[in-house]
Design a protein with these regions (language model features):
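N-terminal lobe/hinge region of extracytoplasmic solute-binding protein
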Residues: 41-91, 122, 205
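Extracytoplasmic/peripheral linker and loop segments enriched in polar/acidic and small residues
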Residues: 315, 387-398, 412, 421-478, ...
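Surface-exposed binding/hinge segments that line
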Residues: 134-191
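Gly/Pro-rich hinge or "lid" segments in bacterial periplasmic/extracellular proteins
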Residues: 169-235
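Ligand-site clamp/hinge motif
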Residues: 224-269
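Aromatic- and charge-enriched surface segment that lines or borders ligand/interaction sites
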Residues: 86-135, 296
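Structural transition elements
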Residues: 300, 306, 319-356, 368-371
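A structural "hinge/loop" feature
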Residues: 42-63, 83, 110, 176-186, ...
Length: 494
């Protein structure tokens, strides 16, 4: 009997021991804990969240977490109502009526009204830098109000009704709603106080899914706005990490749940562990080949572009998470147009003679993306051609017109926003030929195909890569999305 009892005790002990391992294993699996806390690092805790001029994309994320706009942009670039429940546009495309939802509240429990939004737009027009509020400056009377020439209430076509905000533009603007989705247009009360968020965060009320609960030198905490209509995670802890390597080290010991753009050396491992989310972003890089008194003929520019594309493809084959090669498309979405791509491929393969130089010089802004591209191009040319690439990485010097003229090529970063081609091509204005500038400066232009073909035929401005946003996630997270502007959509975190 004693022997049987002994064996029973041994068996129970073994079972309990194994159950302990099972429980331990289950704790390593994803758990959707809405009452928990998510932590991630950024390179600096912001002291202000007023003007967006000097805010990084990660600082903009905070504005998006604690405030909402009339509309937002989904990850697939669709305009969706946010504070608005419905958007009515008149037949001329000039007047917009935003009907507000019934269930929108400030974090103190008071209802968000049309007057709140009108008052915010009034303050935003006064306080924000002009380049950041182009959508509102296209509204009737706003430029005169900003210049102090008229009163807002009587001269600006932004009006509130009982449950709507009505805005009338000077002229049709197909990008108006898209612009309104940007962080600067998100509803913030007492905007001037946001200029010193460290001091004033506790005195503010918030329109978003979160409110700022604490701001210090080393971290900021966001707490769920109990008045929000979205079911979101309870707390977000944003910590000051001097580098992404520091964030990654903390992630490895489970002190960070999110690492945005982790070191490229970690990407393959994270992907294998199914802890990496890769999403397309608008950031892209383009090659400008200077036409210094026709020093490089068309055939030369064609071959240089082809070789640089080969260099980048060689790097991308080993690092396929960082970016997508452009393959002759100025916008990522255009890569679906196989007819256009095939025509450009045929054009780029034309053969001819030209006097190849021993050295080609390359200038670009000093950032991580350009360092990788420049080094890859240099190494590939060294191994595969008789041309030496000498590149320079600069900061403020990139504004020096004379300096840029002394280089054969430039790498330029731009936002490849297919819905705002006017702004996209305007950023290349100084590098366009006279004929190309005439195409760009037409009073009304919706079809940019002639300009694009001219750029490609002349080989003066050419697409290279479209970047991806890579995010490492912990076991706490099963879903993570960026909105159409590249900001974290905290409402989708699960």
């Amino acid at each position: 009997m004693k022997k049987i009892f002994f064996y029973v005790v041994i068996m129970i002990s073994i079972i309990l021991f194994c159950l302990g391992f099972i429980n331990k294993e289950s704790r390593n699996e994803y758990t959707n804990d809405l009452e928990g806390t998510l932590s991630y690092g950024i390179d600096e805790i912001p002291k202000h969240l007023g003007k967006v001029t000097n805010l990084s994309k990660r600082h903009e994320d905070i504005v998006c977490a604690v405030s909402k706009g009339l509309v937002s942009k989904s990850e697939d670039n669709k305009i969706v109502p946010s504070l608005a429940s419905e958007i009515i546009k008149d037949s001329e495309g000039i007047q917009y009526e935003f009907k507000l939802r019934d269930d929108i509240f400030w974090s103190d429990g008071s209802k968000i009204t049309p007057k709140d939004i009108v008052d915010f737009f009034k303050e935003l027009i006064k306080e924000e830098d002009e380049e950041n509020i182009q959508a509102l400056l296209g509204v009737y009377g706003t430029k005169e109000f900003k210049a102090g020439k008229i009163k807002f209430e009587t001269g600006v076509a932004i009006k509130g009704t009982e449950n709507s905000v009505i805005i009338r533009l000077n002229s049709k603007n197909d990008n108006f709603l898209s612009e309104l989705t940007k962080p600067q247009y998100r509803l913030r009360k007492y905007l001037v106080m946001w200029a010193n968020i460290t001091k004033n965060y506790n005195a503010l009320i918030y329109s978003g899914d979160y409110k700022i609960n604490y701001v210090g030198k080393d971290n900021m905490t966001l707490k769920r706005n109990e008045k929000s209509s979205n079911n979101v995670i309870s707390n977000i802890n944003i910590l000051n990490d001097d580098s992404v390597e520091m964030s990654m080290a903390a992630y490895e010991v489970k002190q960070r749940d999110i690492v945005i753009n982790p070191p490229k050396s970690e990407l393959n491992k994270l992907a294998e562990q199914q802890k990496l989310i890769t999403m397309p972003e608008m950031k892209a890089t383009y090659l400008v080949i200077n036409n210094k008194e026709n020093s490089i003929p068309i055939q030369g520019r064609r071959e240089i572009y082809n070789d640089i594309c080969k260099a980048i493809e060689s790097y991308q084959n080993l690092n396929n998470k960082e970016f997508e090669v452009a393959e002759g498309s100025f916008f990522r979405e255009d890569k679906q147009d196989l007819t256009k791509l095939q025509a450009r491929k045929v054009s780029s393969n034309k053969e001819g003679e030209w006097a190849k130089p021993q050295i080609l010089t390359l200038l670009c802004e000093d950032n991580n993306e350009n360092r990788i591209l420049s080094r890859s191009i240099q190494e590939w040319f060294k191994d595969n051609t008789n041309i030496t690439i000498k590149y320079s990485l600069v900061k403020e010097e990139l504004k020096d017109e004379e300096l840029k003229k002394r280089y054969d090529m430039l790498l330029l970063n731009n936002e490849a926003n297919i819905s705002d081609k006017q702004n996209f091509y305007s950023k290349f204005k100084e590098y366009l030929t006279d004929n190309q500038n005439k195409l760009l400066e037409k009073p009304i232009i919706y079809d940019y195909s002639s300009l694009e073909e001219s750029l490609f035929d002349n080989y003066n401005i050419l697409p290279l890569v479209f970047y991806n946003e890579n995010i490492a996630i912990s076991n706490k997270i099963s879903q993570f999305k960026l909105d159409g502007n590249g900001n974290i959509d905290f409402s989708t975190l699960k």
